Amino acid sequence: MKRDVDARGRACPIPIVELMRAIRESSVGDEVEILADDRAFPSDVRAWCKKTGHQLLSLTEEGATLSAVVRKENVP
């Protein structure tokens, strides 16, 4: 299953908080796509995935919008 989260217009740390909530509510293997426009988001999402063990599948930028797709992994 894929979930979509729109965190555009929200400053750090809210996009990561919204991602955490979506991952928590997802099943292992599900993907969450999050849209953000906070310029700190790319480094934040990379660090969060590294820290938590969830997999960052893609990180793209189109205009002012950043898009990350994260897969929930089977981690404690």
Range-by-range predicted roles:
Residues 10-55:
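Amphipathic, hydrophobic secondary-structure cores in small proteins
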